[in-house]
Design a protein with these regions (language model features):
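NTP/phosphate- and nucleic-acid-binding module
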Residues: 1-398
């Protein structure tokens, strides 16, 4: 409901269930989140790749998805081969790594790609943005030596911690998602390999001091996971970030690196998505903040309301200066009464509303109504811009 009211996204029957479309404000929200994630990845040494959205079935035979994964769409026939829209990205990462020769000195190789996957979810399980058929992931795969596992997962945990702080997310625990030990048919790989991977994740999580629990039958078919379970403002639980430790896909794709003795050695793969999926993350954030996003995340950060038409020139000057500073700003100079325009801006949950009239024009100031406060305050425009930029930069939560 909020998504449509705030002009963020919509789902239309003619397009299809579970296939959201994003309005400009929603697209801007997505972009803001994805740029934040990209910045976090870049400073930690992740390298962007790009992969196509359809793939020959041969790739999914190698990976095991055709046998073990049940959310794939019916294939299309192209040049006498079955092609699938991709439900996940792991096999493409494996193939990119495999096409190049790697030395032990190069590892870890950190590949990342923000891309959309398509999954044949059952109609009854679809729900807003939190369960969709087209889902975008900030997907990362790290190819590492066994002695690098702990450091690489620590790097991922550090990124998750910093990202969650930016969104003000603190009520979460880690679920160690294990295999169903009574049903090996659901998985690829030997018990030995699974035991090694599960024990490694246990040790790493215990060292963090974070709350955690173990859950059987929640692992991916190729390896155990750390799933970050978040509780929103009204107590509902959501899975967001995930880290997966994988000894099996490197085996199936025959991946290797050359060690110091010039021998071929199998790398370990660590899968990671901080948002989980962009769509679900946005859906959870909409509900958690009831649409009142933190300032840095708000699609519109400032709304300018001239009291009447004769103050429009000053309002436009203020708008231009705020916009030039890199702050997202809109002006409502419609013929509606000031009271109604203020009510609309508050319904839109705009962080800052600037009301401009005779007093502000004469003094060269702005009167600022901050979301959640009853009274406006008057400031010099440059002072307002300065502290707004400061709050955006430090990702203040209020």
């Amino acid at each position: 409901k909020l998504g449509k009211e705030m002009e963020l996204f919509t789902i239309i029957d003619e397009v299809g269930a579970g296939l959201p479309l994003f309005y400009p404000k929603g697209a801007l929200l997505r972009k803001t989140i994805e740029v934040f994630i990209s910045e976090q990845q870049e400073k930690r040494g992740y390298k962007d790749i790009w992969i196509p959205h359809i793939t020959k079935g041969t790739l999914y035979e190698i990976s095991g998805h055709l046998d073990k994964y049940d959310a794939m769409y019916t294939p299309m026939m192209i040049d006498e081969h079955d092609y699938y829209v991709k439900p996940m990205n792991c096999p493409h990462f494996m193939m990119l790594y495999k096409t190049l020769q790697h030395s032990y000195k190069e590892l870890p190789v950190r590949y990342t790609c923000t891309t959309t996957n398509y999954r044949n979810e059952k109609s009854g399980e679809l729900s807003g943005l939190t369960r969709v058929r087209s889902l975008t992931q900030d997907d990362c795969h790290v190819f590492a030596r066994p002695d690098q596992i702990e450091n690489e997962i620590d790097l991922m945990l550090d990124m998750i911690k910093e990202v969650y702080a930016g969104f003000g997310l603190s009520d979460f625990y880690v679920r160690i998602s294990l295999r169903d030990s009574n049903n090996n048919d659901k998985y690829i790989g030997t018990d030995n390999v699974w035991d090694t991977a599960e024990n490694a994740l246990r040790a790493i999580v215990k060292k963090t001091g974070w709350k955690y629990e173990e859950a059987e039958d929640e692992a991916a078919f190729y390896g155990p996971k750390l799933d970050f379970m978040f509780k929103d403002a009204i107590g509902r639980q959501w899975q967001l970030s995930t880290i997966q430790l994988d000894f099996n896909l490197p085996e199936r794709f025959d991946l290797n690196y050359i060690d110091e003795s010039n021998e071929k050695i199998r790398p370990v793969v660590i899968h990671r998505a901080v948002l989980g999926s962009t769509e679900r993350f946005i859906g959870v954030m909409i509900e958690h903040f009831a649409g009142a996003f933190p300032l840095w995340l708000s699609p519109v950060q400032v709304k300018i309301l001239p009291i009447s038409e004769k103050f429009a020139d000053y309002a436009e000057k203020v708008r231009a200066e705020i916009s030039d500073a890199g702050i997202r700003v809109e002006m409502d100079d419609s013929n509606e009464s000031l009271g109604k325009r203020i009510r609309v801006a508050k319904m839109e949950k705009i962080p800052f509303i600037l009301v401009l009239g005779e007093k502000e024009v004469e003094a060269g100031t702005v009167t600022v109504e901050m979301r959640g406060k009853d009274k406006g305050e008057t400031h010099q425009l440059q002072d307002f811009i300065k502290y707004t930029l400061s709050d955006i930069e430090k990702k203040a939560i209020w």
